[in-house]
Amino acid sequence: NGLDIAVDGMDEVDAELNAVKGLGGALTREKIVAMAARQFVLIGDHTKEVDDLLTTVPLPVEVLQFGAERTQQLLSNLECRPVLRTNDDGTPFVTDNGNIIYDCHFEFAPDFESLDAFLDITPGVVEHGLFLGFADDAFSFLQQTLRLTNLHRNGGAHLVQQLDEFIFIH
């Protein structure tokens, strides 16, 4: 019947709590979990908060290995530079699903709704790291401060609570 709550890390998040995730390579499974949860919470340090998505990190795009070169060409049409993610030894990084990832580097922030729609219909694309409208809350850390940022779908995010002392257990 789904999950009550899912908490996951973020690679970037904007004021509307749209996020980029997947730099660890598990973006498809992360999105499935986020969709299954009644409440989805992002967590990360304050450097993950950005004015515009895709300004500090690339967009991970999980791609089938079959036909990957053609899919890479299609991704290039997005005015980005898709780079095959590799391991330290130079071999392609393979996801838990057996796919590869292209990290798409954008020079300018794209229209995210259009990008999301395009990637959803692009042959060979399994999933992408844009999490638009998924998050309900985001926790961010600033040195020894915990800030709870809450989603306002019509007006961005605002500070709900700030704790100057807390214990972080990992």
What do the PLM-derived regions correspond to, one by one?
Residues 1-142, 147:
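Conserved phosphate- and dinucleotide-binding cores of soluble alpha/beta proteins
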Residues 145, 152, 156-167:
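Hydrophobic, low-acid, alpha-helix-prone terminal segments
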